[in-house]
C-alpha cells in the first residue's frame, strides 16, 4: 500500500480474526473463563450461581454473552483474570426464569474495567 490507507471494502469478515466472527458455547460451572480472543458471541445455560471470568481482554472491544435462564434463582457475576476488577452495569438485571434469554453486552474500557448491559427479549 503506497498511500498508507486500506482500499475501500478491503477488510471483510473473512479477513478478520475468529474472535470477531464466531460463537462459542460455554460449559456450565461455578467459574467459567470467557476468553476475549476466542469468539465474538458466547452462549451459556448455567446450572448454578456462575462467575464469568474474563481473560485476554482487549481495550475497546465488546463481546456478547447470551445466557439462557435455567429456571432457578441462579446469579451471574464477573471477574477479570481471577480478580474483582471493575464492572459497571449500565442497565438491566439477570433473569434466571426458565428459557429467558439474557443478552449481555460487555465492553472492555481499561485493563480491569468493563461496562455492560443486560437485556431480555421484549414481551
Question: Where would I find each of the regions flagged by the language model?
Answer:
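Fibrous stalk/shaft segments of extracellular and virion attachment machinery
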Residues: 1-29
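Glycine-centered loop/turn motifs
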Residues: 9, 25-31, 60-62, 101-102
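Intrinsically disordered, low-complexity regions of eukaryotic proteins
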Residues: 21, 35-37, 97-98, 115
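Generic detection of short hydrophobic beta-strand segments and adjacent strand-loop junctions
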Residues: 26, 30-34, 52, 76
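N-terminal beta-hairpin/loop module of FHA
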Residues: 29-45
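Acidic, glycine/polar-enriched metal-coordinating patches/loops
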Residues: 44-123
